[in-house]
Amino acid sequence: MDKRTLPSRLAAAGATLASLVAPSGAQAELKPGDTAPVFTAPAALGGKTFEFSLAKALGRGPVVVYFYPKAFTKGCTIEANRFAEAQDEYQALHATVIGVSGDDIDTLKKFSVEECRNRFAVASDADGSIMKAYGAVMPLLSSYAKRVSYVVGTDGRIAYAYSSLSPDEHVPNTLAALREMAKR
């Protein structure tokens, strides 16, 4: 191999890898102050299906919209259990919690009972439109959501955003954000 072509080949390989890691059309996550995209979606609570409406939920108070990759996987189960355990705290802050994933509604009916413990709803975003609108599509796996939590204020704007693959801090961080909002 000619030594002069090695740098250009490495540059081409790097560009190819970069295009795979950051697919075109990927959107950035929303930031505080951004308008939250309004959505309706099929959802499940306690094994029963209904149509969740962000606009209607915001009429009752702030909404925690949390995205998770896949029902019944280890991290997503841990996160759902933690949101379920904290529901009394969310309710005391007049907040609604809705989990969103690309899972089908039949899977979420079961997940809403077994892991969400009948305490909060989970919505199906099978076509990925909600994940895309919120910048929550997982790179390379577009049918999966990134683990991102948003607190949406009653004004329809993102009040808080937190992104971490770990499920550990989503509940405490969103509760802290809601407590700060309640002080205002």
Residue ranges: model-predicted function:
Residues 10, 17-43:
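N-proximal helix/coil linker or "cap" segments that precede and/or mark the start of modular domains
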Residues 54-81:
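Short active-site neighborhood of thiol/selenol oxidoreductases, capturing the structured segment around
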Residues 40-62:
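A short beta-strand-turn-helix
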Residues 77-116, 128-130:
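Structural microenvironment flanking redox-active thiols in thiol-disulfide oxidoreductases
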Residues 37, 62, 146-148:
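Short loop/turn microsegments at loop-to-beta-strand junctions
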Residues 144-184:
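Thiol-/selenol-based redox modules, centered on thioredoxin-like
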Residues 118-120, 138-150:
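Structural micro-motif
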Residues 3-12:
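N-terminal export leaders
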